[in-house]
């Protein structure tokens, strides 16, 4: 089994190359997608300014109040069905899901979160409608048909929750016993000193998370990759905008993170 996370940067720029490459993997893959850029665009059209929180360690996350959640669900549903429709046009039987459908992803709402404010002070604030994944119904995600999953979970109280897409992809990979987790974004991999780092151990990835050379979304990707690699899953961070991006990633391009080299 392979779990393929299609990042928002790919979804919003050009997801067609990923879709064209998917049919050969349809019998053994699960797709998780992002789409934060479309969420931001829709929020701004509605006069709502996107809000982000900075956490200790430099990680960031979207602050999701109820109005933002409504837009988040709309945007992710549009992306999900566009991917599914494109796959059907290629003759691939695909089923688009949120984590709420069939209860495939259950999460616990984060009531409070620790942030670093603009003055550099640590504060505890309301967590909004953001969740931490607590259960994956693995048997309902395995193909056939090819499942396309958006990063929306459901709580025990029936609340829809925004969950981190990279974390969701890792949780799915672990739950289904995937051998590989491919994270597709708009960069060629982890770039240090102007060059792609081809291989990392889980321990090396954890150390790099603390480095000033790694910023933004790559910090979170490396953190999740290290956790996944420790579980025996090979993680590949690669470019989703090139021709045949899945083939390219699995054939050695990008950054490969494993438990031990």
From Swiss-Prot:
Keywords, ordered alphabetically: Amino-acid biosynthesis, Arginine biosynthesis, ATP-binding, Cytoplasm, Kinase, Lysine biosynthesis, Nucleotide-binding, Transferase
Annotated metabolic or biological route of this protein: Amino-acid biosynthesis; L-lysine biosynthesis via AAA pathway; L-lysine from L-alpha-aminoadipate (Thermus route): step 2/5; Amino-acid biosynthesis; L-arginine biosynthesis
EC top class named in words: transferase
Residue positions binding substrate: 35-36, 62, 162
Keyword check for Transferase: yes
Function (record text): Involved in both the arginine and lysine biosynthetic pathways. Phosphorylates the LysW-bound precursors glutamate (for arginine biosynthesis), respectively alpha-aminoadipate (for lysine biosynthesis).
Pfam families for this protein: AA_kinase (PF00696)
Feature type site, description Transition state stabilizer: 5, 221
GO cellular component terms, A-Z: cytoplasm
Disulfide bond sites: none
Annotated catalysed reactions: [amino-group carrier protein]-C-terminal-N-(1,4-dicarboxybutan-1-yl)-L-glutamine + ATP = [amino-group carrier protein]-C-terminal-N-(1-carboxy-5-phosphooxy-5-oxopentan-1-yl)-L-glutamine + ADP; [amino-group carrier protein]-C-terminal-gamma-(L-glutamyl)-L-glutamate + ATP = [amino-group carrier protein]-C-terminal-gamma-(5-phospho-L-glutamyl)-L-glutamate + ADP
PANTHER family, per the entry: N-ACETYLGLUTAMATE SYNTHASE, N-ACETYLGLUTAMATE SYNTHASE, MITOCHONDRIAL
Subcellular location(s) of the protein: Cytoplasm
Protein family (similarity comment): Belongs to the acetylglutamate kinase family. LysZ subfamily.
EC number: 2.7.2.17, 2.7.2.19
GO molecular function annotations of the record: acetylglutamate kinase activity; ATP binding; N2-acetyl-L-aminoadipate kinase activity
Keyword Transferase assigned: yes
A GO biological-process term: L-arginine biosynthetic process
Underlying gene: lysZ
Protein name (database record): Putative [LysW]-aminoadipate/[LysW]-glutamate kinase
